[in-house]
Amino acid sequence: MVRDISEAVQSALIAARNAGQKVRGTTSPNPAVGCAVFDANGIIATGGTEPPGGRHAERVALDQAASINPERLKGASLAVTLEPCNHTGRTGPCDEAIVAAGIAHVYYVHDDPNPQAAGGADYLRAHGVEVNQMDFPVEGLEPWLDSVRYGRVSVTAKFAATLDGFTAAPDGTSQWITGPETRQYVHFDRAMRDAIVVGTGTALADNPSLTARDRDGSLLPNQPRRIVVGTREVPEGNLTRLGYEQYATPEEAFAALYESGARDVLVEGGPTLMHSVFELDVVDRITAYVAPMLFGGGRGLLDGPLVDTIGDAKRYELYDAFSLGEDAVIELCRKDRND
């Protein structure tokens, strides 16, 4: 694993990461990989994984580079967020395409955990390509990696709360705890997910649309599947107008989502659903939007205790933290994710 990264390689890895981020939410069950082809004069082309059945990121970038200037490909370098695949599925092996293009150097971040696709790095080395695995953050791939690791959908629990941990005031009001910058960020985040999950309590109380919208209110190009968990009937409203899927339990919902190709799921439910999901021990990530206000009472994050003593607490580790307007965003991941 290489940690000392040159400026040129770092720029290419950033370009590759950005290319992968742009296609998040459109590629499952395949990973949202990004790729950049570059040489001493800079970035030649970038590419992201196409929807299932389409080209992998490496082929998109190589094809784009060839259309711009095929001569620059010979002896060029390639940065990619996931080890190039070494198998034939709906498309041919990416490692063979890299060798055929005349690429001399490959820099990749994550090993491919899928045994059917792994081995690309070894193939490239055997065919004279210099290959380096880089220590570089690629957040957009993490949910897919979690899904492969655990054999289920990757679950992110999202909530907006006050400093003292309440999601609604004592009278039930909750609009709006967070500011406009945070609310827009949530919509952009939704667009990168395969599905949004709420409980029937939220569906009945809030009449949510569960859409991903741009700043002007228009729908973003990618819309996640809308999932309702619970047995109560959802009345006529936004969800019945837009379309949704309903399952009796979180286990049933997650199993059906995984079987149908979803890999990255966002849970936005109230305290009952959140409690059930945490009890299942399937929450891989938490995104907490914390507003600079106090209620001193009201509706909490969960509808009851998860543990009896501090030694049994469900623990997560800090992944990232930043501000949006007046709010703080705290992102956490499972402590055992790298075990």
Residue map of PLM features:
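Enzymes that bind and transform nitrogen-containing heteroaromatic metabolites
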Residues: 1-31, 45-46, 65, 90, ...
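Short, mixed-charge, low-aromatic patches
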Residues: 14-22, 80, 97-102, 138-145, ...
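Proteins enriched for Cys/Gly/acidic motifs involved in redox and nucleic-acid/cofactor modification
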Residues: 25-29, 53-54, 121, 127, ...
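Helix-turn-helix
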Residues: 34
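Zn2+-dependent cytidine deaminase-like catalytic core
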Residues: 37-137, 278
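Active-site beta-strand termini and strand-to-loop segments that position acidic
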Residues: 39-40, 149-150, 333-335
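Short secondary-structure capping/turn micro-motifs that flank functional sites
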Residues: 114-115, 138-141, 205, 273-274
